[in-house]
Amino acid sequence: MDKALLLYSGGLDTSVMIKWIQENLSMDVATLTLNVGNSDLVAIEEKARMLGADPVFVHDAKDEFAEKFIAKSIMANGSYEGYPLSTALARPLMAEKAVKYAQKIGAKYIVHGSTGRGNDQVRFEVSIRALDPSMQVLVPVREWNMMRKDEVEYAKTHGIPVKLDGKYSIDENIWGRSVEGPDLEDIGKGVPEDVYEWVVPPWKANAEHTLKIAFDGGIPSEIDGEKMKLADLIVFLNTLAGSSGIGLIDHMENRVVGLKSHEVYECPAATVITHAHRYLESLILNRNEAEVKMNMDWQFAKFVYGGLWHDPVMNAVNAAEAEFNRDISGEIKIRMSHGIMYIEGAWGNSFLYSKDLINYSSMAFDQRASKGFIDIYGNATVHSHNRNPKMVKEVQGSSVEF
């Protein structure tokens, strides 16, 4: 009998899939649940076993997710249209583990629960095909044409326990929590407050916090002088910044498949870390570096969001980002209050910024040199403007009234 490995979340879709695959495709079903900061892992594992999955794998990947995926995104200020890529970053890691576990048990098929309207189907399937072209991907949600009410009825008929009180579709990992659902689709209404779980709404956030974040080579390594693993540092900041109302993102998103989607993200740690990292970059990179890096950051976000983590171009992008971040080290002091972040200090040994050079009372910068610079700098504009007689005549012939 053929085997299929299901990326299992414990929700309605993937729970129904276990029975559906067994019943309609006559396959043995194994499940893989990746721990990247999810909750209720024990309950998910028990549920998979109860539904007849065998074997059932739960893989703790929080540290790997932080160090191999989030770290690269931090260096690239990873943001797609203002969204810190939390879900998008996790999908290629899940695809990698799915391929490895499927190969380990001799499964010919990998199954995921993404719909035909979203981005995740692209992210999973492009990565799986790149990693193992012989692996086949099954997507029952696209094939069985069941609406939610049909899935609920199927679950009841087959003795599958499901929670029916969930208003939203939620995906979470340590880098962020994403929420979508019918109550968010009417953009004529405000976002219901029951959406928020990680972040206290700014208008209700009374907690104020000040802290120092130290970066080493572009990666945060310390909070207030205490060294921390990246995953632990992120979890700590999620709680602290969230209590100050930091990290709410009400987002209208352009999906890969061409649809627009209204989603809400809660990304406290990602918001704080990216803000501090950008500020540190502004103190260290010169203008040419900053301009090129800004374009590279956008390319990184576009490729990650679009499911192209395993495209060879990412090797070049990540290598460039690592080079730009080589000297991004220092300490940033941030105050967080009512959803707003304030930079209250910066320290480091690689800063190009110098108060002595910019100070108006300083003699360190010879202002007399500016005249020659302006003459040379403006040559192209002056000559190209004056080669057009019509433009010169229009300016010279215009009158000014006093």
From Swiss-Prot:
Residues the entry annotates as binding ATP: L7, Y8, S9, G10, G11, L12, D13, T14, S15, G113
Chief site of localization: cytoplasm
Localization (cell): Cytoplasm
Disulfide bonds: none
EC nos: 6.3.4.5
Record Gene3D superfamilies: Argininosuccinate synthetase, chain A, domain 2, HUPs
Keyword Nucleotide-binding on entry: yes
UniProt: L-citrulline binding residues: Y83, N119, R123, S169, S178, E253, Y265
Cross-referenced Pfam families: Arginosuc_syn_C, Arginosuc_synth
InterPro entries in the record: Arginosuc_syn_C (IPR048268), Arginosuc_syn_N (IPR048267), Arginosuc_synth (IPR001518), Arginosuc_synth_CS (IPR018223), Arginosuc_synth_type_1_subfam (IPR023434), AS_cat/multimer_dom_body (IPR024074), Rossmann-like_a/b/a_fold (IPR014729)
BP terms from Gene Ontology: argininosuccinate metabolic process; L-arginine biosynthetic process; urea cycle
An annotated GO cellular component: cytoplasm
Keyword list, A-Z: Amino-acid biosynthesis, Arginine biosynthesis, ATP-binding, Cytoplasm, Ligase, Nucleotide-binding
GO MF entry, a single one: ATP binding
Pathway annotation from the record: Amino-acid biosynthesis; L-arginine biosynthesis; L-arginine from L-ornithine and carbamoyl phosphate: step 2/3
Coiled-coil regions listed: none
NCBIfam families for the chain: argG (TIGR00032), PRK00509.1 (NF001770)
Family classification: Belongs to the argininosuccinate synthase family. Type 1 subfamily.
Protein name: Argininosuccinate synthase
Lineage: Archaea, Methanobacteriati, Thermoplasmatota, Thermoplasmata, Thermoplasmatales
Name of encoding gene: argG
